[in-house]
Regions:
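Beta-lactam-recognizing serine transpeptidase/beta-lactamase-like catalytic domain environment
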Residues: 3-55, 60-290, 299, 320, ...
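Ligand-recognition elements built from short beta-strands and adjacent flexible loops
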Residues: 309-331
Length: 331
């Protein structure tokens, strides 16, 4: 429903001592470098910084394609390890190819050629229609300052290559809170939500004075598409690239991502994973980003275990018992 339980940026800092760097030693830093480090530490990257989402964005594209009726679960695709789009040879992360696979397997494998084909089926008009419908093109309206806007191609400038790269989450940027908010609309049955930290106003003695309300809109996508996407994303954990997001006793859905930072070929990446649970009736969703990891940089390897740990702690705290089927509305 948009209520934010936690929002964390690392490194953190002590509000009582904001000028002390909570990083490596600053003794050898110039004043300029120290100020840059402080500014970075103070920024709320979840809201104020944009990034290329990579394969976590495939949740948006998959839901759009299902809603538009341009793809069915049993549709088959072929991945030779790349796809030629105009004069570009755009590769899959599995350079030897996934071979023949269904649409569901394409999501499980996070296969770029499958999503380039799905994006082509959607077309530019449909793609931008659903980006608008799912809120990608606008700010979330979160109740904290400094929210950044999505940086997206102008529709009239999108050709086949741009459409292909957009389809697997590259060549544009958005904020983490924007992505998770839009994915939440897909998971919650199709209701547009406003992410928020504030729940109610209280008097000095703790008495509730006013319950805060936020804009919401139903039927952004169909409940059938929502249910189908939850099923597909649960299979990403049980059968696909999100196995390390598994939490014993819970049905977890997830989508991993690995995006290369600009400039390309700099060997700098953002590893990410979005996860939610219980998969059949979600009560909580989370997004983890690891900026410029050293060594292994795949989201399924290093970000998915963080999602697993988060959900393993959050679900019991929220009163969801292991093995329990949730029947109440998501909270």
């Amino acid at each position: 429903n948009g209520e934010i339980y936690a929002m964390v940026n690392v490194p953190e800092f002590d509000l009582n001592d904001p000028y002390t760097l909570n990083t490596t030693s600053s003794k050898n830093m110039s004043d300029k470098k120290k100020q840059e480090a402080l500014n970075g530490m103070w920024r709320n990257a979840c809201v104020s910084d944009t990034y290329e989402p990579g394969s976590t964005f495939k949740v948006i594209v998959a839901a759009s394609a299902l809603e538009a009726g341009v793809v069915k679960l049993e549709d088959t695709f072929h991945c030779p390890g790349f796809k030629v789009v105009e004069d570009r040879r755009i590769r899959c992360h599995k350079t030897t190819g996934h071979g023949s696979e269904t649409f569901v397997q394409g999501v499980q494998n996070s296969c770029n050629p499958v999503f380039m084909e799905v994006g082509a089926r959607l077309g530019v008009d449909n793609m931008f229609h659903y980006l608008q419908q799912l809120g990608i093109m606008s700010k979330t309206g979160i109740d904290v300052p400094g929210e950044a806007s999505t940086i997206m191609h102008r529709k009239e400038n999108v050709g086949a290559v741009e459409l292909a790269t957009m389809s697997f989450g590259q060549s544009f940027q958005l904020t983490p809170v924007r992505l998770l908010s839009s994915i939440s609309m897909i998971l919650n049955g199709g209701t547009r939500i406003t992410p928020h930290l504030g729940v109610e106003l209280e008097s000095s003695d703790g008495t509730a004075v006013k319950k805060l309300t936020y804009p919401a809109q139903e039927n952004i996508i169909s409940s059938q598409t929502s249910e189908t996407m939850r099923m597909i994303l649960e299979s990403v954990v049980s059968e696909g690239s999100g196995k390390k997001a598994y939490v014993e006793g819970y049905q977890v859905g997830a989508k991993t991502g690995t995006s290369e930072k600009l400039p390309r070929h700099s060997n700098k990446y953002i590893a990410s994973c979005m996860g939610f649970a219980p998969a059949d009736h979600p009560v909580v969703a989370a997004l983890v980003l690891i900026d410029e990891p050293q060594g292994i940089y795949y989201g399924g390897t290093i970000a998915a275990p963080v999602i697993s740990e988060l959900l393993d702690n959050a679900l019991p705290y929220l009163g969801v018992e292991r093995g329990e089927t949730v029947t109440a509305e998501p909270g």
